[in-house]
């Protein structure tokens, strides 16, 4: 059963009752953040932050979480069966592989922000970092499958590659669900790495833009003195957000997935909603870190 109350055994549909509750929670988180931004909550409870935007960063965090949930479903993951050449995909778990792409993206995005200070270049740089990491990973995986294990790339979900038109049945070994990384899975991996890293970098940058002025007010210090702390906190929370959304997506996938051509890809809307709700709640908590209590 999914986090949104989906059908048992990994059904593809959306449970609208659970989705309605999730959207309500998301809206409540946004309203609370708006109240803090406008200092509408009494000073005895929260002090508020003067002149610091909070609602738009939270919305950015929600969008980033949704991008992570969306991108994870592109990544070809085969788990233990793939390690034995009995299923297509990369021989690891969904969350671990997605987290690797996300960390690569965070490094790329952090470097781009330091070098340029431009918002769009930063999130694009993060996305490119994640996509490049997945491109190299998928290439080395296929080299290992073909030249070390001696198995060609063959999908078990479709009979023909949607991009190249190559057929798979004659290359698929008996008793397996396929093996290797077909071209569509390779492209899916690169797209998934780009989207997940894009979302993770967006979350990092939104948190950083809240923490830098927020810590200045909270600690009464200069911008230069709080910058290392702001960068550290934003990085820690961004990694945490990434893992939360990657694990939620992994539960939604329930096992292995070959990429965008896999029937499990139809579950994407459910993952996007779940990740958006989780990001809203976690984002509210992350923002409260710099609110005077």
Question: What are the functions of these language-model segments?
Answer:
Residues 1-79, 263-292:
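N-terminal signal-anchor module of multipass membrane proteins
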Residues 77-96, 214, 253-265, 269:
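Short, non-helical or kinked segments that cap or interrupt transmembrane helices
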